[in-house]
Design a protein with these regions (language model features):
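Feature 14080 marks short, conserved micro-sites in well-ordered regions
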Residues: 79-91, 97-99, 104-108, 124-130, ...
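Sec-dependent bacterial lipoprotein signal peptides
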Residues: 1-14
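Bacterial Sec-dependent N-terminal signal peptides
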Residues: 13-52
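Short beta-strand elements that form the blades of beta-propeller/WD-repeat-like
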Residues: 51-63, 102-108, 140-148, 179-188, ...
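Hydrophobic strand positions within the blades of repeat-based beta-sheet folds
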Residues: 56-57, 69-70, 96, 105-106, ...
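Surface-exposed loop/turn elements that mediate protein-protein interactions on large endomembrane-trafficking
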Residues: 70-81, 112-123, 152-163, 193-205, ...
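Repeated scaffold domains used in trafficking and secretory/extracellular systems
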Residues: 88-100, 128-138, 167-177, 210-220, ...
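Beta-strand-rich domains and repeat architectures in extracellular enzymes and scaffolds
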Residues: 48-68, 86-94
Length: 388
């Protein structure tokens, strides 16, 4: 395999910045949807996805009062609701799940978990749980949650538990076609075991090359495996076998198998330096491997080409965006709460970015262009769907 010169994409790289462009403007009154002439665009703003609808959710700061949770559709406000205990709505971005234009939220209080749909009560659980993931499949809501006062995890279908474990560490809930999938691992007597769950049916994973199994994933119906046989990482599936030399001077933290277009997969091997307080990813793609700086946190968007990586730099004041097309972007003084604040469509990456210092407006970023939303607050989620 090709071993490219190692490089670290850290804060020392030069910045690619662009000015704030003309704003989208929204009503701050009680109306649920502003007039169309209150929304303006210009030639410097990113193009909206063709024949698609762009939804975004966010939190509006209100001086002296609770924040407002708001949902936008193509820049037009759909509804607002106060973030209060009484409404069971939190301003925390981790509790917002924007799926197919519907805003689901989670809220924990007094030993219970409340799930809302567009601000209205939907489900109630008798335990406090952290909602890690949600999927909406043919109007059926799937969720992955971790009890706050118990071990293990639970998968629910429309609020009812359909799969649960009292031990085990789950990764993300994801779709493979219409199949709901999950990987989780257990540790017993210092031995790690990996399981794949497909539509609530679990299967223990056996490494095909008798090496140490690090990861597994279902992609387009096939199981991909990531193994380690010192000094090589092995990424494989049916009729595919790729071997990558490990990076010396680093310790293994974790791994992810990244789904790509054309039924392919790559691997991200998360590493900690033995000589400096920094982390990095060894990326293994096709017959190439290289090292990529990880900053404070990184998120991958790989299902469409070009594949993209979004990295919050180590000092947490810059966002670095790069991809397989060779383009690089820096955005300063912004924060990016979680992976649900990004979406790929038509070969472009759309990100919800908010001002770290609270000054200026949050905006949708796309390929270096910005579409500001004219309110003081933050954007907490995005999704792109076919029009209703």
């Amino acid at each position: 395999m090709k071993q490219l010169p190692l490089f670290l994409m850290l804060a020392g790289l030069f910045a690619c910045s662009s000015p704030i462009h003309d704003d989208l403007s929204f009503s701050r009154g009680d109306t649920t949807r502003p007039n169309t002439d209150e929304t303006k665009n210009d030639n410097e703003s990113p193009e909206l996805p063709k024949d698609k609808t762009l939804y975004a959710c966010g939190v509006i700061y209100v001086d002296g009062h609770p924040s407002d949770l708001v949902l936008f559709k193509d820049g037009l406000r759909q509804f607002t609701i106060k973030c209060t205990d009484e409404n069971h709505i939190s301003p925390d971005a981790d509790s917002h799940f924007l799926l197919d234009g519907i805003l689901f939220t989670s809220f924990n209080t007094k030993g219970k978990t409340f799930i809302s749909k567009n601000g209205e009560p939907l489900y109630e659980f008798a335990t406090e749980e952290y909602l890690k993931d949600m999927l909406l499949v043919d109007q059926t809501l799937w969720s992955l949650s971790i009890p706050l006062n118990e071990n293990g995890f639970k998968i629910r279908k429309d609020g009812e538990v359909v799969f649960s474990k009292q031990d085990g560490s789950p990764k993300s809930l994801y779709l493979d076609g219409s199949d709901v999938c999950l990987e989780y691992s257990t540790l017993w007597n210092m031995k790690r075991k990996i399981y794949l769950v497909k539509n609530t049916i679990e299967t223990p994973v056996t490494p095909p090359h008798s090496a140490t199994l690090l990861d597994a994933r279902i992609h387009e119906g096939k199981i991909w495996y990531l193994e380690y046989n010192n000094p090589f990482y092995i990424l494989s599936t049916n009729r595919v076998y790729r071997q990558f030399m490990k990076t010396y001077g680093f310790e293994l933290l974790d791994t992810d198998i990244l789904p790509l277009e054309n039924s392919d997969c790559a691997a991200a091997i998360h590493l900690q330096s033995n000589y400096a307080p920094m982390t990095a990813d060894q990326l293994c793609i096709k017959d190439t491997t290289f090292l990529s700086g990880n900053g404070t946190s990184s998120y991958y968007y790989t299902l469409q080409a070009p594949a993209r990586k979004v990295t919050l730099t180590k000092d947490r004041d810059k966002l670095y965006i790069n991809g397989s097309d060779g383009n690089e972007y820096f955005e300063e003084n912004v924060f990016f709460p979680n992976r649900r604040c990004g979406a790929q469509e038509d070969g472009k990456l759309y990100l919800c970015l908010s001002q770290k210092d609270g000054k200026g407006y949050p905006f949708i970023w796309c390929e270096g262009k910005k579409m500001p939303y004219k309110f003081q607050g933050e954007l907490t989620g995005i999704c792109i769907t076919a029009p209703n």
